[in-house]
């Protein structure tokens, strides 16, 4: 007769929302804990709905967990090392939570392009990434890869992530990606830039490129619609915060404090930016909150609006015939005064960056519920549902009559 041996690596979890595992008591009063803006239009972003939890501690386990379209909640634990860009193609319905201290890192400087970058989402849909720290090897201009790349992906929410020292960029987006929310993320550079790259720049701390080329209209026209909210471009950021082509991009309650900024927001061909209630606090950021990067000839359409910001004068300018992008005409949202942005966004406890607190799904934890058990399900460690328990390690999910779910890591033996 088989015997279930519980290893007591359990956590009480439910599957009713995209933020079930977050300690909401520790959040900023201004943190809505949900995707906002462009990510709410149409289908919206739900990720895994916190279904099918799995904890990963290796690159191989992370890649396997991200694959496919089955909803899966992936908890990243510890530091996972990369030796080059990993491309995830066609994934859907995933939520990735970085447990406190979780890092995705490619720390070794290389002059070989294939050895740069960390993670690429390509042709993906309905993906949530939260509380992850991405660490690159330092900026180096060789047309390499980024810490995180969004390629032809839709309904993406990146929240409370910390991006450091991307080789080509920290977080870039292009090739028709759309309906994106980047919230409470921090971008900075801690490593001195590497010189001598084939691209010609000895300081390529260019953090976010939104739209890769003026001639990519077939893919990017009408796409790249993104809301950046409560993000922080911190020390070391030189340019591209972000630099935009084609997209209607809303920058809301963001903080610009880099002392080495050549410019902050860059406007390229057919860009349409709305910069609202942001704070430009460093002298460099105040000097050039916006720069027109529209090219000559036929590639010179652009729009931008700066309104109610700290350290930047209200202004609305365009070249060409594109209508101004006004976010309130597209979606509803909440905001706060620009005078509060620096204290809110730079708060080390709950501001931008990987500051979320979570319940570790592998920690020992007892269920407080005394309700009757109504269902018991089993899942493999990669999150796949099992029709019946089998010998080895698996996850058992117990559902009680009051809706409580208790997840246990178990070992089944004879």
Feature map (PLM): residue ranges:
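All-beta strand scaffolds that present successive hydrophobic residues in beta-strands
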Residues: 74, 96-98, 127-130, 156-159, ...
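Extracellular beta-rich repeat passengers
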Residues: 243-360
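Extracellular "leader-to-stem" segments immediately downstream of a signal peptide or signal-anchor
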Residues: 2-12, 17-72, 83, 308-361
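A glycine-anchored, Pro-Gly-centered beta-turn/N-cap motif
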Residues: 390-394
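Residue-level detector of functionally pivotal "anchor" positions at catalytic/ligand-binding pockets or at interdomain
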Residues: 360-385
